[in-house]
């Protein structure tokens, strides 16, 4: 009784707290119930689908010559995607994710019944695969972008044919952006769940075990011996993308011989390069361009499809009697002469050269993701779940650069052997299929004894830098990529123990000197006085592409560059000639090039049609805009002397450790990165401070610099839009300055490719809401940093944020002129302005002679170089 009375007394005393707790529990229950209701399939809930967590990278790859790196796991939330039966002609317009338990059968909605198809019940394993791929193994001519081997949707609605399970498939469906891609994913997963997608077993025709021919050693004496029979002829398959036409020409000039054949595929997204390559091919009968084009993403199934289709084309070109198929990219370059290559292949005319991974197969299968199902659509490789390797075969793989005999290519393209047909089906849904398909077919085929474990290449692998998951935005996996060769790597190019005839990768925007060294090693030096040997130009914009490919930042910068240059032309000449040198720009620039000299970025070259202010015909000028350095190294101590440079930019490349956005052009909506280079020295901790144009301390953070650290970089999560104008980044140690740099956030004169309107300018140029770049305020540091009073700068920023039209252009030009200067102008043709030199006589101009990248007529020895 005493205890009961005590309980009642406690209840009376704390009844308010108890009531509050019960109310909170009731509210939580209602919230949970309401959120579970969101998962039900109700009409009009299109936007409530929750995305899974981003992919989590796993361990890194160490395979000898494979691009596959580490796997990423899909979103962690488990659940089901399912379709709902609708009235005829009314497909489900969306999919919903159910998180209810499996035993809650009352909430289940059965999948839409699949349409009847003749012979559907008999499709299983390889038979289903053949039905999907088609008789030829690849689809008829047409657009690409997804793998046509997948069952295609019949309409734009998304109608799952089954109840889809598995976290990988659910994650892919949640992230796919188009209904067609979602439908393809659902169809593939449903076939896979039913066991009708992958072959269960594949026949093996090779009776040998292990590696067939581990390698062939290079023998200088044997290489000089005469060849029995006619010399082999080679079909080079060049797979290119981007805009580096000059580097492609340099490669073609190095490998060209009139006895060989050259077939070039240009990525469907690279229209400028395609136009240039088509023009190039018109000069030579043995150079052709594929009449079709594909979007070939890194690691995608479309790359294998492109190779198979190209091989069939090459086999069917009349008069092209080639013996070997060699694939190259524009970043490859020969390391031995054509004569040495032909002699070597003529002595080994029955061998196929492919580089294997060099590890046990079970480890390779896991690292390469061969035990996972992938599908390509929306220019992305989606991981959809696990699968089994077909029984009965040995799976091999490694590098997707190879040298294949014509007989093996014919076997792969034309055979009706179930080995090839079923492996085509298997590799249609495989990550990096070109790195394994040809290896696996050959190692299980009757020609397995012809395999040599060497692809005749040397690749500049640096896993520490090259395996940074740099392709995770297009592949649900962490991949690796080789590094560019530099002069210090030249000894690696001189392989003496094994035959190597090509090397990769080379990029002239990163380092051209190593190409000069290699070219001299192969062919000797150019004649004395040869121009432009240290210069390199690369197009970034061409009028034929239209402005659609330009960002608003680039469009703003290029047009402002033209205005600055024309103003310079009118003021930097003798007074008497001034009226003849006043020009007005006509339209947008016609082309823009990056200009490098001696492996240093020198600026942008803008070609612009202009109208003289005086009477006269229209002219075309090229203008050179050079960036002005703003780095200040301020420290004097031993630790401070470690700092070598401090840069801010976008498009940071962790593999080559440079900014791909040369010149650092960025706008209010960009996400800049601060990078520091260090010399070796004692450990230190540095503080990085970002200051905006109105002296707002946007952010501050510390970086630890170990004794052997060479590069540090960080992208702070700043709220956008960034305030336009000159920003400052300071590097300090114990609040003593080590260095400082300035960078420009460019005021935009264009928004969505149209002149900026006032209602857009008022938010785009006003900085972040409440001047808060981060959740935490760092303004308390302004006193320590001795920043000026912000009021005058804030008032100027408010006025600038309202500008449009000519006033906005004047502001943009003024800001840009603080970071860029006009280094030169020239005329593409005769000009009324006497101070303008012809561009073809101007050493920095993009039309100046460039013999190293000019092809010219075929010489008496059948070569171009």
From Swiss-Prot:
GO terms for biological process: chondroitin sulfate proteoglycan biosynthetic process; heparan sulfate proteoglycan biosynthetic process; heparin proteoglycan biosynthetic process. It is an enzyme of class 2 (transferase). Residues 37-865 are lumenal. This is Xylosyltransferase 2. It comes from Canis lupus familiaris (Dog). The chain crosses the membrane at residues 16-36. Disulfide bonds join 162-190, 206-448, 467-480, 469-478, 581-833, 826-839. Residues 39-157 are annotated as: Disordered. The gene is XYLT2. Pfam families: Branch, Xylo_C. Contains disulfide bonds. It is a single-pass type II membrane protein. Residues 73-82 have a biased composition (Basic residues). Residues 53-65 have a biased composition (Basic and acidic residues). It catalyses: UDP-alpha-D-xylose + L-seryl-[protein] = 3-O-(beta-D-xylosyl)-L-seryl-[protein] + UDP + H(+). Its cofactor is Mg(2+); Mn(2+). Pathway: Glycan metabolism; chondroitin sulfate biosynthesis; Glycan metabolism; heparan sulfate biosynthesis.
